[in-house]
């Protein structure tokens, strides 16, 4: 499946802007990368795509390499001291250099001291290209980005890292600006009023974008582009979403199963013995794209339907499309192995999720939803919240992190509890060793203890949602309300101020643009550039998978008039969120940062 959305834009930037820009027919080159640039490339490109462009070998700059003095090298590097020193070292040897010549592409702005060092080195004689391509983010999905900076939550919110805060915000601002520039956007910037971080980050992004705009005056031009917005929200605006057990396929799988680096591992039973299978869950799998945002109750049904349709189209007979049946069909029709394996993977994945759900999660979901909503499935306000949570806290079969999720949801609903009450709850739950984790929610801006032991919540106003939902999936992320308000142009300007006034848009101008171009036009590089407006959302402190889903849902609801992208320093699962909280009262030497 061809890359979609944001991934397609980044692939094009790397293939056209880097590799093809220095390519000559019939000439092979070497591609040298460091860890950050390799992460960017592998998030959107296959090795076969790179090799098809006349690259003979891809190497890591920090590893020992065999010299190939007959070939020129393309360097795609982050502009760090370590990578620049390794680059200079490649051209210090005698009698020959490691490569014939160097085409250097930095993923971002190279600091002046490093630039000067390059100029003074022997490398200067063989440099044929030297460019900064401003690509300092990972395209995680078609509409999701990551700045690949999971440590930033610690730097921003741990009191021991107060001296790092300003520098960390500046780095994040630069990365967000490269995202906007890559998308050819110069958006109006808004932030949630209140927290210092969101305002500071918003102003820093504007300064970086203005520098890009000075270099490329056409950035963000186009009648509908003036409506594009970048919205910065902090995790404290919605600490509920990353705590809940989500029952949509992607979020549920990443929460309940051990999926590392987007790889799902499971046992398959073959003819004789069982063996482990590893499957990458990404957008190359069109079935995953179709299923990932569906409720688990609908997933198995959908896979079974699709499998039945596939079997009928190939004239295969199947009574019931299940995993056992699949292995029989595979034996008969090995030529369809690739397609049938895909169905098998998703049946396994759904089955795995349901096993965990039926085991211990089912009883937690209702409690979590009631606490998140402040009301039960009938819409009745919860009168006795203690009665709701005590059975969970006392249940020895519920794992500590699951108890903590319920405990934090209770504290958030109450807008904090008294110190005495908190101590009792922690004791009931038998999670004394996690008491600092629970209190650390305060570092993010949540209220954990207050002297009054208040029973009133200070939550943002929520939309009334009338569409039918599953009883255990009533909550929708706060950011979904905010996204809908932006595209309907009704987001409160006092609560979400602009850093600078948005450009005026006349409706006639917007209409002409749509009629003339539709929502797309081609740019010089040959990729389809979006002419309609974009909403780019950045959440300080990590983005939850339910929030990622919201970006797709809101885009779909606008029927393509808007494209919503969302991202953060890193992608959160509930475990990851609690792990992040756990570090916020610790010294750097005491923790293992990701």
Curated annotation (Swiss-Prot):
Per the database entry, which stretches of residues form a coiled coil?
none
Any single GO CC term annotated in Swiss-Prot or TrEMBL for this entry: zymogen granule membrane
A UniProt-annotated Pfam family: Sec1
**Subunit field text:** Interacts with STX1A, STX2 and STX3. Interacts with STX11.
UniProtKB keywords: Exocytosis, Protein transport, Transport
Give the protein's function: Involved in intracellular vesicle trafficking and vesicle fusion with membranes. Contributes to the granule exocytosis machinery through interaction with soluble N-ethylmaleimide-sensitive factor attachment protein receptor (SNARE) proteins that regulate membrane fusion. Regulates cytotoxic granule exocytosis in natural killer (NK) cells.
Q: Which GO terms describe its molecular function?
A: syntaxin binding; syntaxin-1 binding; syntaxin-3 binding
Family according to the record? Belongs to the STXBP/unc-18/SEC1 family.
Specify the species. Rattus norvegicus (Rat)
Q: Which PANTHER family match?
A: VESICLE PROTEIN SORTING-ASSOCIATED
Q: Which GO terms describe its biological process?
A: cellular response to type II interferon; exocytosis; intracellular protein transport; leukocyte mediated cytotoxicity; neutrophil degranulation; positive regulation of mast cell degranulation; presynaptic dense core vesicle exocytosis; regulation of mast cell degranulation
Name listed for the protein in its UniProt record:
Syntaxin-binding protein 2
